[in-house]
A protein has these predicted regions:
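Extreme N-terminal flexible tails
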Residues: 1-26, 30, 702, 708-711, ...
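Hydrophobic helix-and-loop "lid/oligomerization" segment in the mid-to-C-terminal part
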Residues: 2-4, 11-142, 162, 180, ...
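Acidic beta-strand-to-loop metal/phosphate-binding motif
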Residues: 87, 141-148, 585-592
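Short, ordered loop/turn segments at secondary-structure junctions
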Residues: 89-90, 117-120, 148-149, 171-174, ...
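Short Gly/Thr/Asp-enriched flexible loops that form oxyanion-binding sites at enzyme active sites
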Residues: 97-101, 153-162, 171-172, 358-361, ...
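Acidic, two-metal ion nucleic-acid-processing modules in DNA metabolism proteins
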Residues: 106, 240-331, 386-400, 406-731
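Active-site cavity-forming subdomains of large catalytic enzyme subunits
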Residues: 132-202, 206-211, 219, 236
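Short alpha-helices
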Residues: 180-230, 594-597, 601-605, 609-616, ...
Length: 731
């Protein structure tokens, strides 16, 4: 059945004609104008700044706390030919952050090395053993962290004790106690007053680069765009400026590694946007850090050797494929371990790759709609990630170590605490009366009419991009349309393309992961969709297509699966009239009881969200009918000629002569017997020639047969709506 994944909330409209006129000057249609107005943009100045952001809108990097100290120390290191280590992170934000600073320092003539920690051997953030190696073996005298550092107390204290200064540049959550670093550059530093708090790690690195070079180094913005999009920070203020310029730069990038990676990924650079980066580029970079040594990414992003770039890009793409396989394997295994009796899941196993557990937890959350904790067991510890529904803040649990935000967490705990963790979470949910089954909200920005939808509508909304956190891609509400066709597509027919029409207007809706619902989308009445707008380019033609976000059905869902071509859905229970279900929202009406009227009481007492009508009939009387007046007359006339007739041995001959099916003939003879037209003794039938004249309709057997035939005809040949109305007593 079609079940919505979200709780839909349609925004109310507004009627500010003045703002609509202002928006029109910027090339926006009224629908786009309404969306911006509801997102807090009301003046012409705000509107112009949003639609046409400028590099002049970037804030002064020296407003960041300790920026002056960081610049002074790095410049001194360059002047004194000190060895500088850039210490990054193993994700796309960390990779781009390190690459930005590497190119900046090399441009300034610095002696610089870059190291990205290995997730499995070094862990996240400053690692004392790594610091020790670079200090003792490589002669490093200045360490600059990017996208990490504010939690690296021990490693930074060690470096400072060894006479090596550490400049921290980071954007992660500040702790109460900060490390004793030479400088800490952070947009949320408690002693700072930076006007925008939501920079990614690469954004902070870029601000440092601008301060060092004393100019806005726009050539680095392609890397800033990748890291900012990948880290899913707020797409507002200067992040919006940097990403918009960076995406333009990416479309014409001269970076050999990015060119090769995009070529291998099949990315059309002309149509590249924030979704291309978020769903195709960033996952490939992240896959490297999730599974292996992330350091080759630095050469990919900054190198000039085309052949080496090609080889690294191939390797990264293969890691991404491997990542998908690992995720699928863990996901499949985790599903076999689910505890259906709990309002949450805590799943742990040896051998699971901790680098992908967040992805697995997210997939399980999407399917189960309840908090999920997925952990890998190694050396007596369980380490992994959690994903949670809106109703439950996972931080309320007790962890040895944790990180993340409300709804997502990373943690490490002793394996003997696993059951305690699960019980703690269960108790928290029960004690706080939390509804874990409640769906997350989906804001629908506007109801659209298919007949008013054009490519110009899409172009208007493209001006609002790049989309992301705090500037989400608009989601539109569609209803009152017809489904013209549905077809599966993709590997294993995993996806759908649904053609919807209204009047002369028609558009394709692409529904990823809905291939198993082809029948439902083709038959559902009252179908309503939540979609985003997208462009489809094929064979030189450009058209508007819709991308499905969610779907629901207004009213009960009735599906016709009669006939051999429609299998019974594996995940929907079959109705057993003798053991009726009480809690299911969907049911399959498979084999019908002989007395179909017995179903009416059941369906009038129970409400279902979806009913699948298979309607298999064990004894299909409807195929033969209930006997016509001529058939009864011909039967009587035939048997009247005989003194007696042995029905045990001559029934088939009689049926053949009368051209009546055996099963119907038996019923007709039973009707004659009931009306006393004949008697039957030991299988021998004799005509009662003194019987009173009576109507066939006086027979109870005839009435029951007629009713059965009519009911079976409805169940076999009627529409599902007619069947439903009859079962529910609506007619």
């Amino acid at each position: 059945m079609i079940k919505p994944n979200y709780d839909w909330q349609l925004l109310t409209g507004f009627s500010d004609e003045h703002f609509i006129k202002l928006a029109k000057k910027e090339g926006l249609d009224p629908v786009a104008a309404k969306l911006l107005y509801e997102r807090g943009i009301h003046s012409q100045e705000e509107l112009h700044s949003f639609i046409q952001p400028s590099l002049e809108d970037l804030h002064d990097p020296y407003l960041l706390h300790d920026m002056d100290k960081a610049v002074e120390r790095i410049r001194r290191a360059i002047e004194d030919y000190e060895q500088i280590l850039i210490y990054g992170d193993y994700d796309a934000d960390g990779m781009t952050s390190a690459s930005i600073l590497k190119e900046t320092l090399e441009e300034m003539g610095a002696e610089v090395q870059v190291y990205l920690p290995n997730r499995f051997t070094d862990g996240y953030g400053p690692n004392q053993s790594v610091y020790k190696y670079f200090i003792e073996q490589q002669g490093i005298s200045l360490i600059v962290t990017v996208d990490n550092g504010v939690a690296g107390h021990e490693a930074i204290a060690y470096a400072q004790e060894m006479g090596v200064d550490v400049v921290v540049t980071d954007h992660h959550s500040m702790q109460e106690t900060l490390p004793n670093a030479y400088a800490i550059v952070h947009p949320e530093h408690p002693e700072g007053n930076y006007p925008f708090k939501h920079l990614a790690g690469c954004g902070v690195a870029f601000k440092l680069a601008c301060a060092l070079l004393e100019t806005v180094h726009a050539d680095l913005l392609d890397l800033v765009a990748i890291g900012t999009i990948a880290d899913m920070v707020s797409m507002t203020d200067e992040n919006r400026v940097m990403v918009k310029y960076g995406l333009s730069l990416l479309k014409q990038t001269e970076r050999a590694g990015l060119q090769e990676l995009m070529k291998i990924a099949g990315i059309d650079m002309d149509s590249l946007d924030e979704e291309t980066v978020g769903f195709q580029l960033a996952p490939r970079l992240n896959a490297l850090g999730r599974l292996d040594d992330p350091n080759p990414a630095i050469e990919l992003l900054t190198g000039f050797d085309d052949e080496e770039a090609h080889q690294i890009a191939l390797m990264i793409d293969s890691k991404n494929l491997e990542r998908k396989e690992v995720v699928q394997a863990i996901y499949d295994e985790a599903k076999t371990m689910l505890r259906r009796d709990r309002p949450l899941q805590v799943l742990a196993k040896e051998g699971w790759n901790p680098g992908v557990l967040g992805i697995v937890a997210g997939r399980l959350l999407e399917e189960l709609h309840q908090p999920v904790v997925v952990l890998s067991i190694e050396n007596g510890k369980a380490k992994g990630s959690a994903r949670s529904v809106e109703a439950v803040d996972i931080f309320k649990a007790l962890f040895i170590a944790f990180g993340g935000h409300a709804g997502a967490a990373g943690m490490t705990l002793a394996i003997d605490k696993l059951e305690e963790l699960a019980q703690t979470l269960v108790d928290y949910i029960i004690e706080n009366n939390l509804d874990v089954s409640s769906k997350s909200s989906l804001v629908l920005d506007e109801e659209l009419d298919l007949e008013e939808l054009t490519l110009d509508t899409l172009k208007s909304f493209e001006k609002l991009a790049p989309y992301g956190m705090d500037n989400k891609k608009p989601v539109f509400y569609l209803k009152n349309f017809q489904v013209e066709s549905v077809r599966t597509m993709g590997q294993n027919n995993a996806h759908l393309k649904v053609r919807i029409t209204k009047g002369a207007a028609g558009f394709d809706v692409v529904a990823f992961g809905k291939g198993n619902l082809a029948l439902e989308f083709s038959q559902a009445k009252g179908l309503e969709l939540a979609v985003t707008l997208s462009v489809n380019q094929w064979n030189g033609n450009t058209s508007l297509q819709l991308m499905l976000v969610d779907a629901r059905v207004n009213g009960v869902q009735l599906y016709n699966i009669r006939g051999k071509q429609h299998p019974i859905p594996a995940d929907v229970p079959i109705l057993d009239i003798n053991h009726p279900v009480t809690s299911e929202s969907a049911i399959v009406l498979a084999t019908l009881p002989e007395d179909i009227s017995s179903l009416r009481n059941y369906f009038q007492e129970k409400e279902f969200e979806a009913i699948y009508f298979k309607n298999e009939i064990a004894k299909p009387y409807y195929l033969d009918g209930y006997g016509s007046r001529d058939q009864f007359a011909k039967l009587y006339k035939t048997i009247y000629q005989f003194d007696e007739f042995d029905v045990r041995y001559k029934l088939k001959d009689l049926a053949g002569y009368l051209k009546i099916k055996d099963s119907l003939l038996v019923k007709m003879i039973q009707i004659f017997q009931e009306l006393e037209f004949v008697t039957i003794t030991d299988g021998v039938m004799r005509v009662n020639k003194e019987a009173q004249k009576r109507e066939i309709s006086e027979s109870q057997i005839y009435q029951e047969l007629k009713q059965t035939v009519m009911q079976q005809e409805l169940m076999a040949l009627g529409t599902v709506q007619e069947i439903y109305e009859r079962l529910c007593g609506q007619n």
